[in-house]
């Protein structure tokens, strides 16, 4: 859904204003035009009460949010923004497939190289009262087909971990039967895999943009022209504008050192490049899914900060490159705004014209992104 002009102006005012009191005034006056408007602003100064919500990395294992949650302020058009109110805030950690694999191996009493550090990580999550989620692993599981019996072991390992009060190696590998409600929950998780099929369009879109950027990076033209070609492909071939991904690819095409580690998998030509492009697309989708969960929670009247649990350094780097500044919704319009966008770094009339033309499009038809990815994959294969 393209953001409407009035919505865009409202969000831009919030984005560019630096005075917290003026931000409150802007929200209170402009949000009256909506039936329901909730936004979280992540740049209004550190709140000492939100110290427990800070990002952490423990011996390489992360609890990373998509912004600095300790600097957040929750806006709701049903309340005066300057008045004190009590808010219940939850925190959920989304464990990636690698972390779940380590957990499954410990439960199955298999050797784990970094065993004690990992158990300490699991203990910290439990003691700090994070809710557990494996949505991003469900997503990964679809991309890397796993036998149903093996996948059931993953799910039961997570459910067992959630059930335990005391986390030790012995308690994790103990064969104790779980309470019946926990088995019901495990079945619900297994059944929810079907919902994740809907996310495949998002995967193919991101994979297409990464593939096109990789192709352009191998060509002899200046970085600005490469980015213009990528933007044109995104807007006119894929019929979509993804600011986060385009910002990342702008850095990638300009050989920016800040993204070198994050995109190490797609920095050079290799026989594994298509697989590496897919893996990087999944990394980016982890972030997208976490953001979507936060918005869905807000729509239900809940404020829940979501984190990614991973040991993947590339994913950790991507999460930190361009954190959220504002997230939420204005009626049915989702709002996701980050600290930076590529328009701050590359001023060009051609870009402005391309974006304006895209915004004013009326006849946006359906695009088969799977076919688009298959097509561009053949172009990537020719380079190898």
Give residue spans per PLM region:
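Active-site-proximal, substrate-binding regions of enzyme catalytic domains
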Residues: 2-306, 319-326, 330, 334-384
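Acidic beta-strand-to-loop metal/phosphate-binding motif
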Residues: 308-310
């Amino acid at each position: 859904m393209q953001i409407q002009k009035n919505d865009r102006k409202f969000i831009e005012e919030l984005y560019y204003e630096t005075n917290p009191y003026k931000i409150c005034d802007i929200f209170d006056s402009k949000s009256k035009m909506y039936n329901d408007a909730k936004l979280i602003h992540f740049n209004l100064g550190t709140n000492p009460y939100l110290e427990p919500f800070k990002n952490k990395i423990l011996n390489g294992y992360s609890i990373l949010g998509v912004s600095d949650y300790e600097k957040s302020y929750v806006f709701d058009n049903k309340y005066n923004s300057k008045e004190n109110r009590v808010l219940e805030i939850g925190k959920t950690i989304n464990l990636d497939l690698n972390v779940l694999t380590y957990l499954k191996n410990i439960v199955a009493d298999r050797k784990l190289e970094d065993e004690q550090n990992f158990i300490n990580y699991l203990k910290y999550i439990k003691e700090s009262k994070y809710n557990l989620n494996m949505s991003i692993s469900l997503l990964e599981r679809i991309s890397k087909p796993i036998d149903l019996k093996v996948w059931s072991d993953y799910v039961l390992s997570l459910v067992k971990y959630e059930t335990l009060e005391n986390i030790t190696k012995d308690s994790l590998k103990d064969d104790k039967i779980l309470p019946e409600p926990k088995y019901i929950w495990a079945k619900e998780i297994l059944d929810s895999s079907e919902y994740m099929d809907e996310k495949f369009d998002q995967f193919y879109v991101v994979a297409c943009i990464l593939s096109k950027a990789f192709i352009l990076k191998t060509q002899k033209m200046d970085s600005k022209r490469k980015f213009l070609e990528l933007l044109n492909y995104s807007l006119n071939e894929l019929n979509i504008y993804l600011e986060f991904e385009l910002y990342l690819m702008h850095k990638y095409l300009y050989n920016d050192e800040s993204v070198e580690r994050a995109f190490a998998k797609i920095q050079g030509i290799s026989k594994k490049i298509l697989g590496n492009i897919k893996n990087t697309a999944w990394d980016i989708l982890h972030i997208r899914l976490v953001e979507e969960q936060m918005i869905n929670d807000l729509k239900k009247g809940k404020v829940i900060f979501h984190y990614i649990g991973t040991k993947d350094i590339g994913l950790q780097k991507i999460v930190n490159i361009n954190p959220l500044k504002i997230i939420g919704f204005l009626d049915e319009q989702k709002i996701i705004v980050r600290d930076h966008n590529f328009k701050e770094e590359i001023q060009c009339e051609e870009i402005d014209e391309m974006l304006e033309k895209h915004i004013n499009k009326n006849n946006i038809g359906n695009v088969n992104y799977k076919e688009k990815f298959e097509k561009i994959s053949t172009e990537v294969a020719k380079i190898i």
